[in-house]
Amino acid sequence: MMISKRVKASLVIVVAAIAVTAAAYKISKSRTFQFFGDIVPRINTRQKVVALTFDDGPTPGVTEELLSILNKEGVKATFFVIGAELERNLEEGRKIVAAGHELGNHTYSHKRMVLKTPSFIESEIERTDQLIRQAGYQSAIHFRPPYGKKLVLLPYFLSRTSRKTITWDVEPDSYPEIAADSDKIVAHTLEKTRPGSIILLHVMYKGREESLKAVEGIIVGLKGDGYSFKTVSEMLDILREPPPGAQAFLPAGI
């Protein structure tokens, strides 16, 4: 039986729509590509440097325990905090700043920043920026999207406001079979880390105790491998002023 031209056209439209949707989904979760501005999952460098980053919170109790570990090991980290959590726990944010760490913006509500209006995106970021300033943080505020999700409007806003999208290339506690065991988290991190890596850990909530337990082992293990720890800002400085003999540049299409 002959298929009418109208049916054929409809099928083509459906197939095209599916393809576009699939492509948009893939792009939205990519840690290495976006339509506007710079996205930084890591930096390419020969230097054995890494950035240790923590998402969510700040959470009373956990924050103090984590700061104690970092202080003991002499490591500075970058905390991508949720605005609503910071608003409830502003003193925790002040403790992070007082200890010499960086505060980054992880939006106010931690909603996926796709299919959102420009005004919503702007409000989520600017509201959290204001809270970060209230916590006493005065340096550049870096941004990481919740779940790493972005499509068009978020990267456009960040580009327009001269911000890079900070993602990551090592996230051990995203795998359930690894996240349940601190030793596995440590082993996975040591295996996957390379010069210029940005490590992401989630330690701020109940159920993430194993991730918190893994922090010291990760630091000790990487130090033993010759790595030093930098904040995200310090990693980006390597891009601006690469030391003699080193190569440092934004990754493209990794």
Language-model-detected regions and their locations in the chain:
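N-terminal Lys/Arg-rich, disordered targeting/topogenic segments
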Residues: 1-6
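Hydrophobic membrane-insertion alpha-helices, especially the h-region
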Residues: 9-24
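Active-site beta->alpha N-cap acidic-glycine motif
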Residues: 28-116, 120, 124-127, 131, ...
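C-terminal domain-boundary segment and adjacent tail
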Residues: 35-46, 72-74, 87, 209-254
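A cross-domain feature marking catalytic cores of carbohydrate-active enzymes
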Residues: 54, 81-83, 105-107, 145-147, ...
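CE4/NodB-like, metal-dependent polysaccharide N-deacetylase domain
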Residues: 67-76, 102, 118-152, 156-160, ...
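A short acidic, helix-capping loop that chelates divalent metal ions and anchors anionic groups
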Residues: 111-116, 174-176, 201-202
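His/Asp/Glu-enriched short active-site or ligand-binding loop at hydrolase and phosphoryl-transfer sites
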Residues: 149, 155-192, 226-238
